[in-house]
């Protein structure tokens, strides 16, 4: 009987386990998850904290009980602490009893995800300072935000999660400050003009501090944060959210001798294989094939994690499937503005010395004679050699994301800008 062990029970791991179970009814499939939570959707956490819904269980795609009932040997609160690739064994610690035991595998999948970057700031570990990375973070922050004494919240960072948290906390009536070291938001996910557009849109909704570096935090007599000190001033705060980004959670792989990228991601091929025989990886701990750049890249998104998890399951059970590729397609609702991106940005094309051209337009989301129209900002990046579309970015209050999906489909299919312009899409004035 084939023995498959999966380390990690969230997106990629549970997608792989469920698919492997469907493909091979006889295989023994064991999932080790160090927390008590499995199959939860991280994308919903800001909105749960912000009170858009109150039942945390709706973020769980499949309960532990349902997983076990399907024939998967799920072990929660069990952490794999060592991989013996030579003898195909893992060393596991039961976190409730602290006892250790070994388990053998024929195929091993590492899906340990990513972890929040914690900045080197004085007093960063005092009370009422947290990340929003794990399910437990969301549960804890939800309870904290019920405290009416928590009025002023500072968010460190200005990426997708930071903006979503800001939106959520404003929904709760909190006063929100965003503190960002650079002069833009979203990092390199959008070109600067889309960062500038979003800054203009949100600056009246949050206290936005760009080009400002946090130096330290100060605690009150209960060891909870009371103030935040930057290189430009001191601010009274009741809570601090750390949202400056993530890094691959790959220490276990590193200790095993698995090759890592410069940023610490587990390097895999298009089949999900690492450099060590019978060991695979998927999700936010690993690289993923970039369809535009034709190389492995680090794109930590739930969509890619779930797809790669399902694909790797085929290979764990005897197949030889290759992943068709990610475009890094992502979207966000920045208060009332939708932003979406797919493929590569102009800055990325320039950085990689790709011969490219761009076209940017501002238009209306529907016919001008029909009421309540809104502006749409659209940018395409395309090859100067063959005019194939390389990337797209769209922003607007309505319809930006669905239009970006059309661009993603065009990139995936290898369409040129000319062919995109001739697509027979639906039209009506509203």
Language-model segments: which ranges?
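Beta1-alpha1 glycine-rich phosphate/pyrophosphate-binding loop at the start
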Residues: 1-77, 166-190
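Short hydrophobic core segments
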Residues: 7, 103-113, 235-245, 309, ...
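Flexible, glycine-rich terminal cap/loop adjacent to redox cofactors
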Residues: 7-11, 15, 21-26, 34-35, ...
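Catalytic nucleophile loop
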Residues: 10-13, 159-162, 313
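A Rossmann-like FAD-binding core segment of flavoenzymes
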Residues: 26-28, 69-96, 103, 171-270
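Rossmann-like dinucleotide-binding cores of NAD(P)H-dependent redox enzymes
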Residues: 59-60, 152-154, 160-216, 299-305, ...
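Glycine-rich dinucleotide-binding loop and its adjacent helix/turn
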Residues: 110-172, 208, 262, 268-270
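FAD-site-proximal beta/loop scaffold in flavoenzymes
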Residues: 125-149, 224-227, 234-315, 406, ...
């Amino acid at each position: 009987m084939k023995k498959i062990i999966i380390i990690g029970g969230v997106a990629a791991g549970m997608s792989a386990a469920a698919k492997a179970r469907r493909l091979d009814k006889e295989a023994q499939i064991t999932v080790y998850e160090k927390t008590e939570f499995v199959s939860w959707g991280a994308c919903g956490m800001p909105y749960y904290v912000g009170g858009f819904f109150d039942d945390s269980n709706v973020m769980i795609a499949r309960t532990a009980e349902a997983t076990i009932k399907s024939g998967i040997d799920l072990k929660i609160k069990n952490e794999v602490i060592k991989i013996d690739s030579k003898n195909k064994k893992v060393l596991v610690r039961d976190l409730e009893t602290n006892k250790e035991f070994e388990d053998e595998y024929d195929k091993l999948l590492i899906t340990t995800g990513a972890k929040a970057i914690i900045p080197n700031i004085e007093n960063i570990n005092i009370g009422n300072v947290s990340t929003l990375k794990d399910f437990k973070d969301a549960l804890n922050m939800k309870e904290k935000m019920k405290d009416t004494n928590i009025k002023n919240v500072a968010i460190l960072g200005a990426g997708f999660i930071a903006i979503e948290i800001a939106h959520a906390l404003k929904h709760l009536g909190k006063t929100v400050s965003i503190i960002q070291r650079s002069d833009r938001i979203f990092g390199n996910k959008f070109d600067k003009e889309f960062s500038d557009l979003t800054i203009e849109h949100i600056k009246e909704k949050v206290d936005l501090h760009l080009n400002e570096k946090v130096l330290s935090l100060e605690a009150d007599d209960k060891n909870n944060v009371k103030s935040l000190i930057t290189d430009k001033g001191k601010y009274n705060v009741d809570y601090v959210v750390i949202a400056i980004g993530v890094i691959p959670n790959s220490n276990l792989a590193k200790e095993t001798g698995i090759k890592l990228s410069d940023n610490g991601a587990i390097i895999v091929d298009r089949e999900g294989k690492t450099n060590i025989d019978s060991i695979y990886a998927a999700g936010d701990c690993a690289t993923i094939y970039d369809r535009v750049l034709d190389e492995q890249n680090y794109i930590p998104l739930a969509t890619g994690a779930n797809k790669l998890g399902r694909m790797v399951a085929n290979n764990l059970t005897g197949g030889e499937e290759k992943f068709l590729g990610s475009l890094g397609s992502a979207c966000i609702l920045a208060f009332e503005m939708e932003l979406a991106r797919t493929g590569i940005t102009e800055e990325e094309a320039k950085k990689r010395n790709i011969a490219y051209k761009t076209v940017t337009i501002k238009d209306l989301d529907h016919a001008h004679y029909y009421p309540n129209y809104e502006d749409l900002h659209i940018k395409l990046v395309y090859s100067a050699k063959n005019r194939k579309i390389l990337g797209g970015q769209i922003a607007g209050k309505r319809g930006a994301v669905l239009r970006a999906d059309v661009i993603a489909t065009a990139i995936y299919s290898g369409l040129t800008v000319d062919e995109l312009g001739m697509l027979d899409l639906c039209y009506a004035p509203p």
